Amino acid sequence: MDLQYFILAFSSIFSILNPFGAVPVFITLTESYPKKERDLVAKKTVIYALAILLAFALFGEWILKFFGISLDAFKIAGGILLLLISLDMVRGQQEAKIHRKEIEAAYEIDEIALMPLATPLLAGPGSITACMVAMAEASDIGDKFLVILAILLSLGITYLTLLSAESVLDRIGRLGIRILTRMMGLILTAIAVQMIVNGIRGALL
């Protein structure tokens, strides 16, 4: 098992999940709920997101093989996708991931937790891609376990953040959330560029 690989996988997945950026949307959707129901929404959101990300992480390689897509091609495409998302984060435009119609259509706890919170806010194209690439690049079973651990840790932190969403917003404010989002976007930009470089190098060699 490679600790450096775990750090890379965790950084990529956690940055794209960006739990702090999810706080304003979570508060908007659950503002009329009592604390107990808000906590239930947070729990179900993370469970749904975990199921989606694990499914693509574990079976993503077979999906690529089924469609005849090489890992290097997927790295390039995935890197470009992550780069576009990260640039939106740096420019403070990540909220475009959630459309107003999706927010207005979400009424019940299960509906809110699944859509738009679990997907596309948390388990969206970017985080799914990050998980699939991290798992596909794992050199052995130990590294694959580290990717799963990175997913669990990232969503664990996300769960704790959503549980204390109002406190987080009060403490760091919307400006603080924007700053954190931009910082995570910068980290993700570097990871995305490296992913593209690795994909091109692998395709040419």
Swiss-Prot record:
It is a multi-pass membrane protein. It holds the Pfam family MarC. Its main location: membrane. It comes from the Archaea. It is found in: Cell membrane. One of its GO terms (cellular component) is plasma membrane. Keywords: Cell membrane, Membrane, Transmembrane, Transmembrane helix. Belongs to the UPF0056 (MarC) family. This is UPF0056 membrane protein MJ1677.
